[in-house]
Amino acid sequence: MSETTARRGRPPQTKQQAEQVRSRIVLATAEVFSRTGTRGLSVAQIIEQAGIARPTFYRYFANATEPLLLVLDASNEGLVEGIRNALTVTAEGVELGIRLIDAFLDWARGHGPMLRPLFAELHDPASPVSGYRERALDEIRATVREKFSELGRPIPSPLDLDAALHVCEYVVYRISASAAPGSEPDPETVAAARVTMIRVVLATLGNTDDLNYAMELPGIFPAAPQ
């Protein structure tokens, strides 16, 4: 008999296999959250969605909130990084505002049905979504102020900046809520929403030169009646 006895049963997981299981749990959490929000999120639903045993779940997470926080981390990072990247270009005025708006819409497009519970809980202090929203907004505010300072433009007042960001949030919520469950908003709705967002952002964060320039762009503002 050898000095060591061979281990019985299945071989230990590799690091790659462990990461795959962990990712599977996080993905399942996102899918359950999309249907139920945080109020209906439970370990039982997550393991059913992931097709794993309860002991497997607890090998990676202590409760249903832990994988949800990873979902929210990824969501925040996607929005903040998307806006940060959009504002790194040497753009001015109108183009800068449009890039900010397109970053919001690109972020929303990647969330699908998750947008409904995400936006429904944005202003609920009891939901972890609310705290994540505030952290994301703080980072976005700092990014916008830094860009305005870099361009030598007056820094927007806190109220103007929040008005612009909250309108972007609200419009994205409206178009996501109008879509059928499990589907994306139709392109016409998104295009109309984009124009609404551009108008509001220009009015709150722009100056007279920006508005005059935007007046010449097709489709941004309706022509005055003749």
Regions flagged by a language model, labelled:
Residues 1-36, 40-49, 66:
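Basic, helix-initiating cap at the start of DNA-binding domains
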Residues 70, 84-110, 161-164, 191-194:
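Hydrophobic alpha-helical connector segments
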Residues 1-9, 106, 142-149, 174-226:
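C-terminal peripheral helix-coil segments that are non-catalytic and often amphipathic
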Residues 77-80, 107, 127-152, 158-166, ...:
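Amphipathic alpha-helical packing segments from all-alpha helical-bundle domains
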Residues 35, 71-99, 115, 144-150:
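Amphipathic alpha-helical linker/stalk segments
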